[in-house]
Amino acid sequence: MKNYKAIVESLIQFHAEEEWFEFKENWFEQHAIGEYISAISNAAALRGKECGYFIWGVDDEKHEIVGTTVDYQKDYKKEPYQHYLARMISPDLYFSFHEIEISGKRVVVLDIPAAKRVPTSFDGIRYVRIGSSKENVARYPEREAQLFNVLIHGLPTLDTVEAEYQDLSFVRLFTYYAGRGITLRQENFEKNLGLRTKEGKYNILAQLLSDDCHMPIRVSIFRGETKASPLYSVREFGNTCLLLALDKILEYGDVINLIQTDERNRIMERKEVALFNQDAYREAVINAFVHNKWIDGNAPMITVFSNRIEILSRGTLAPEQTLEGFFLGESVPVNQKLSDLFLQLHISERSGRGVPKITEVYGRDVFEFRENSIVATLPFSIVGNITVD
């Protein structure tokens, strides 16, 4: 039996609803609920989730438990409602309603299994979530093709997606490994690192590790607190072997992390204060690389403002990753192959300390989970006035 109380408490921690779950207080349109079941079932499949959820009793803006009075057992057109839903949904889907109590308030959870093999339809129409809305997937051919591809072949990964570029070289990869005391052998390194698809083509992982990954990775510095401020500089670290790019970005953290002299309340000696916590920066950057959705062709983005650094990775948490588990350090990497490489090269240790190191310094609010990205924001500790010249 699922712990629906824990599920709800986990989902309300998200800053915004995602395509595989929906919050409402008392809204209940019986036919439209069937459309939502189709949409959420298909969205859950696209996200690699086992189930999606429609939850009543939660404010959909503030994500606060408010309780609900919905009656999901009343008949629809003289037919038992759940029988009506089951009759209209195809293929057969074992959805279920559950009543729970949280903080003394009634909450109703509709558990919706993800689509398997073929998309879930309601009344002959296949729906999908686009943002917070539900749409007929036939109106979006690319999304429909993606849904069928996921249902047939599974979620795309770094090692299953063919690279756009096939003329790849790996001189820098060999040098990097040698610098870590590991010898790669020309005759078997591609197989050992898993750099080709089943069809024998170079995959995205190979492209990332090649001498030119064809992905720009930039650190942008603005003079003010927003991107509307004057742009001070842009440093380019991409378009090389990803491992080298990561090292350079971590080293650049030392350059921008100004050490300030704090003479306030000075008695015996000056106090040196770093602009931000270097360990937290390192962990946030590595975390962004491991969880970034590289298969879409987009790299993480690091932006420095006058009062903070924002480290953005594309995509969302891994399907098996819960929000609470993420904060506890029970990490499920989005890119398992890349995570394995980082472990082998001692870039990360997979001990579960990365995220807790960040939250210990800055708290959980340092992370923002957006619809298609995760942002870690490290605020600056500023002594006096600092300006970028």
Residue locations for each model-derived region?
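A short beta-strand->alpha-helix segment at the C-terminal rim
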Residues: 357-363, 367
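Phosphate-interacting basic helix/loop segments used at nucleotide- and nucleic-acid interfaces
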Residues: 26-49, 186-194, 268, 283, ...
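Glycine-rich/acidic phosphate-handling loop/turn and adjacent ATP-lid/helix
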Residues: 309-344, 383-389
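Active-site helix-to-loop segments that bind/position phosphate- or nucleotide-bearing substrates
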Residues: 131-296, 304, 318-320, 324-331, ...
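Short, low-complexity, charged/polar intrinsically disordered tails
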Residues: 2, 369, 377-389
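Interdomain "switch/hinge" adjacent to the Bergerat
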Residues: 92-96, 100-159
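Structural motif
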Residues: 102-103, 305, 370
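Polybasic/polar functional segments that serve as interface/processing modules
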Residues: 1-95, 99-108, 116-118, 275
